[in-house]
């Protein structure tokens, strides 16, 4: 039996409903077992999208990119140098990337501010929805996504769902080392993050199902 058949059989036995078991098995496989993203050759990339992963909180309350986002910025700048593609990235990645690229080729994405002037958390989905609200996704052409390795599959999948022609850059190793001092607790170690990522995948799928 295949992995999918085994999952369907288990869920069918648990739920007593073979039809629902098949549908649920497909969801479980996609949202909890799939940790790869479709890839594309680097020379085909026309736009680079960079997603932040955590940050560092200073003693005075200020936020800085931190080591993970600095590593992502290096990758974004390298890809931009190889392809000539512009970089559109959350500010934690855009700020250090701009220091590595000349000519204003990096466009930062900033979060909104609340009534106290504090930044409002901007989710992966929120980033992409904001970009799509301003600019048609198809206008970006082939999009190469730069993101933390465990975050990358969801970034690509979410972008594709919103109409971006998005891929992981082929042959480019994304950062894998978690920052134990991250200002976002779910970005400090792997197991909590993987659970967090699965939760978000399932939450977004639930929302889509309820929206009909």
What are these regions (language model features)?
Residues 176-212:
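C-terminal capping/extension of enzyme domains
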Residues 2-5, 9-10, 14, 18-189:
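A structural signal for short, hydrophobic/glycine-enriched beta-strand patches
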